[in-house]
């Protein structure tokens, strides 16, 4: 189940709010400029589906986002517990960073924890299958895929270079809960 846990940045052990209804998650995140939606596939997606099949299943929603926000590049990222670089990738994504463009992810399968550091608060968004999250450019955040990752996500970019991070050097992520496997 998708969830949103809100903390004050100085109290990682004490959540201020825990939400599990998609509408509540979406409205709370909208207050800080983050988009959260639930999508349904237009066609069933089989295990092991190709990038093209995944994109085709969500073509209507993807095209709508491209028109609305000017995204030019779409791809599919898939990571599981057999990936040879899972530990290195997890460590990299767990460092607080920001991007010069929106970070848009739609979870086709599995789950991941997006943690957003906005002003004095930390918003931990557990994204699962059918969740779309759009983190605005410049937002400090980190991502945890867990020790045993399993996710397939559609990514949209307005930068043809794809994922380009600017790391903040802040170790705040080390003080907050990780994704439980």
UniProtKB/Swiss-Prot annotation:
Ni(2+) binds at residues 97, 99, 103, 141. GO terms for biological process: L-methionine salvage from methylthioadenosine; L-methionine salvage from S-adenosylmethionine. The record marks 102 as: May play a role in transmitting local conformational changes. Binds 1 Fe(2+) cation per monomer. Binds 1 nickel ion per monomer. Pfam families: ARD. Its cofactor is Fe(2+); Ni(2+). Gene3D superfamilies: Jelly Rolls. Its EC number is 1.13.11.54, 1.13.11.53. One of its GO terms (molecular function) is nickel cation binding. CDD domains: cupin_ARD. The record marks 105 as: Important to generate the dianion. This is Acireductone dioxygenase. It comes from Pseudomonas paraeruginosa (strain DSM 24068 / PA7).
């Amino acid at each position: 189940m998708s969830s949103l846990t809100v903390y004050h940045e100085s109290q990682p052990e004490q959540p201020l709010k825990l939400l599990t209804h998609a509408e509540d998650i979406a409205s709370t995140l909208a207050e800080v400029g983050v988009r959260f939606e639930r999508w349904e596939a237009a066609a069933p997606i089989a295990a092991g589906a190709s990038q093209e099949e995944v994109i085709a299943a969500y073509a209507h929603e993807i095209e709508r986002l491209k028109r609305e926000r000017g995204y030019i590049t779409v791809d599919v990222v898939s990571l599981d517990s057999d990936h040879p670089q899972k530990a290195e990738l997890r460590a990299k994504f767990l460092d607080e960073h920001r991007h010069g463009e929106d970070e848009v992810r739609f979870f086709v399968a599995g789950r991941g924890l997006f943690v957003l550091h906005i002003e004095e608060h930390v918003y931990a968004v557990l994204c699962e299958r059918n969740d779309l999250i759009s983190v605005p450019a410049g937002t400090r955040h980190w991502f945890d895929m867990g020790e045993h990752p399993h996710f397939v996500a559609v990514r949209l970019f307005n930068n043809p270079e794809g994922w380009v991070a600017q790391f903040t050097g802040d170790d705040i992520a080390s003080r907050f809960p990780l994704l439980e496997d």
